[in-house]
């Protein structure tokens, strides 16, 4: 390499004495150029194919791309996911696998390569699952490895479940310095439900605080998995990556060879392309599919022609055919988002499969809120944006009775909008930011609420997620709210503050177990409404960031709930109404009225701001009127003249108060809605 470097450098001419006039120095013969050396890359033990290298040279990590498209036997296909708690190095490990197998050139490599959205890079989290096809050589045998990267946050566990349904194995990545976290357990249970082969991986062993032996013991004690042969690696430093690839090949079983059966392919993801229509990601379970085949989506019954099929490596690369066990994408000029749903089965129109694949259980939305455009003219744009966004956000599709049917929600304060359901607060924030960034919308989002069961006096039970639609007290018998079981893992020194938090949120203590000498699992059952606010932030704050949580819905229970209305100048503001527990109604009402008093501009008349439960006012503030000095023109004279002017002013203010309307500015709405999220 030094020779090649030297040959490119400018060599200064040797210093000589001045030439005598009239004499010409004979030209020196040009030196012959040294032979150009062949660039060699440091491939780990020659395991990855380099199609450009001669047969006698060792294999290289460089991949020209076409090798990944070559067919391999079904017995040499491995479909796997990477599952982990958030921030345990899952995306970094995926990057190293792509780099080592030559799927992505080193000069093109960047952090979180599979995370395509700006939001994912800014927040350092994975939101959408991504797929990538890799080629790996072991014992001179080529293998096709299909990686499906998954999110780690609890709000996106539905994305994880869809990924696992398309795989036969999973890498369970655990941070060697932090140990087993709450979402680690949840992901393991998902993998076991799908009957996957799980390979434990201890990541970040290069950190000074890493304790791989302790963490391996934790996994054995908590999960019950043998970790004697757990792979110890550092995705950042590239340590142990080859051992992981070997384990994928040797431990994860291949898919079943059902290529001669009728086509059945499971759709596990999709997105909308403005030029090509709906792009479908699928896993071929039975049979095969070719470019130009006439296909049918079994749930919708719609038929299309497969204009383009290919693999994700990780960019889209066209192929002519995909067989059973392979993962790829499909484009068929699909313009209707309803025709290609996640979980649907693709089959041939001429030779249809007898039954569809099981698909996925629908995600249950946990949090509801209203989305309103600040500019009323953007209402139709918001409708179109939600239609496109719901295609590749499977959780949004589960909301069939609310906004995803696009039934408009109207508010006297904020105009027309939609009511949407989300899996959690982070999911809600991500959807809002995607709508604003990708579709250039300016939105107001109302305070989050949950779905309540209202038992009416006539014996009927109705669901209500919008406080403004809650039946009147005389028509309802009781209200039931959803409860969740929450499992918090925390170091033992923070058990006290964690239990205080559970008690403050109307939680019921269930059990506490020491999973290791220094870490405990604290289990509470509490209302979902108490958790959708700042519960997670408080959990991190009280544990100095060391605690984690995982929750699941356990059912509905009757509670003493009331509807809290906010009235401004006697008029209720529907957008600020909320459902709260009676014990918290006063504190919430007081906080909202004080905040509104700070934000609403003063008027020419006195404006009362009241928090009410039915007809009863429980908290009140008032904006004093702007006073005009009507006596300024009276320099003297009879007192009756002054009294007449003051009386006339008082009558005018009384009339203005009776017919006047107070406009709440958008800034006040946004500030109060943010406050509601904090105090509820």
From Swiss-Prot:
Keyword Secreted: no
GO terms, molecular function: GTP binding; GTPase activity; ribosome binding
Database matches in CDD domains: EF4_II (cd03699), EF4_III (cd16260), LepA (cd01890), lepA_C (cd03709)
SUPFAM superfamilies: EF-G C-terminal domain-like, P-loop containing nucleoside triphosphate hydrolases, Translation proteins
Alphabetized UniProt keyword annotations: Chloroplast, GTP-binding, Hydrolase, Nucleotide-binding, Plastid, Protein biosynthesis, Transit peptide
Residue numbers spanned by region Disordered: 1-68
A GO BP annotation: translation
Reactions the enzyme catalyzes: GTP + H2O = GDP + phosphate + H(+)
Biased composition (Pro residues): 28-37
Residues in tr-type G domain copies: 75-256
InterPro entries: EF-4 (IPR006297), EFG_III/V (IPR035647), EFG_V-like (IPR000640), EFTu-like_2 (IPR004161), G_TR_CS (IPR031157), GUFP (IPR027518), LepA_C_sf (IPR038363), LepA_CTD (IPR013842)
Presequence positions on this chain: 1-51
Binding-site list for GTP: 84-91, 149-153, 203-206
Localization, UniProt: Plastid, Chloroplast
PANTHER family associated with the record: TRANSLATION FACTOR GUF1 HOMOLOG, CHLOROPLASTIC, TRANSLATION FACTOR GUF1-RELATED
Protein family (similarity comment): Belongs to the TRAFAC class translation factor GTPase superfamily. Classic translation factor GTPase family. LepA subfamily.
Protein name: Translation factor GUF1 homolog, chloroplastic
Organism phylogeny: Eukaryota, Viridiplantae, Streptophyta, Embryophyta, Tracheophyta
